[in-house]
Regions:
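Sec/Tat signal peptide C-region and signal peptidase I cleavage site
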Residues: 17-23
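N-terminal low-complexity, acidic/polar interaction/targeting segments
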Residues: 23-237
């Protein structure tokens, strides 16, 4: 990403994604540890080209394709769990079939749902836990995969201290950037560590494969550290 474009995106994002970010003078407590999730051995797959779900993050979705409307209907009659996976580049050649996907995805549970008059759904999917696709079942209107859960244990005391340090580092970098751009930041609050990761990734305007790489990192601390490194590099340009 060119530095001028990066700075412009960051400048716009400082206000556009303020709900997920915090300044050094307005620290917020860390989010409670993620509740352990017991995933089923198989999950329906919802592959998209530009959306990556993360644990402890809520994702609004609109479901309009008939096959995925059937998927949601079946999920609502069962455990309400759907597996989000990212489509690999080149998916367009076989979008209606079984285009290639990244093996690591994130399972989510439907927490809110509304069926519209035309049969479409609007829903909110709350990220539960990462998984790896080991195989797919044949047949059916939508894809179903056998999975291996990839749990992320809650951070220990040392990791929690490191997360706090990275949050402070991010806050300092954002404050410095705001000063450089002549922006007067207001008192922002931090919803959660996972929310900070998502907000910062949005500020940095990551491409889908970069979101995927972020998901595949083993927890909030390495994700936050990776994004803070990128932010620091950009603010030096």
């Amino acid at each position: 990403m060119r530095s001028t474009v990066a700075v412009a995106i960051l400048a716009a994002g400082l206000s556009g994604h303020a709900e997920n970010l915090a300044w050094a003078q307005s620290p917020a407590p860390a989010a409670p540890p993620q509740t352990a999730a017991v995933l089923p051995s198989t999950v329906p797959l919802f592959p998209l080209p530009d959306v990556v779900l993360f644990p402890d993050v809520s994702l609004p979705l609109r479901i309009f394709e008939p096959r995925y409307r059937a998927m949601v209907a079946d999920a609502l009659e069962g455990n309400r769990i759907i597996g989000m996976v990212l489509l690999r580049p080149g998916y367009e050649a076989d979008y209606e079939g079984r285009p290639p996907i990244f093996a690591v995805g994130c399972a989510g549970v439907i927490t809110q749902v509304e069926q519209l008059a035309n049969g479409e759904y609007t829903l909110v999917l709350r990220g539960l836990q990462k998984f790896e696709v080991t195989s797919e079942e044949a047949g059916g209107p939508y894809r179903v995969a056998r999975i291996t859960p990839l749990p992320e244990p809650p951070p220990d005391e040392r990791q929690t201290s490191a997360i706090v340090a990275e949050r402070e580092r991010v806050a300092s970098l954002l404050a410095a950037l705001a000063d450089r751009l002549g922006i007067a930041p207001g008192p922002l609050t931090l919803r959660s560590d996972a929310g900070l990761v998502i907000g910062l990734a949005q500020l940095l305007d990551l491409e889908p494969p970069e979101w995927q790489a972020l998901l595949e990192l083993p927890g909030v601390l390495p994700r936050l550290r990776s994004l803070a490194d990128r932010l620091e590099a950009l603010t030096r340009q």
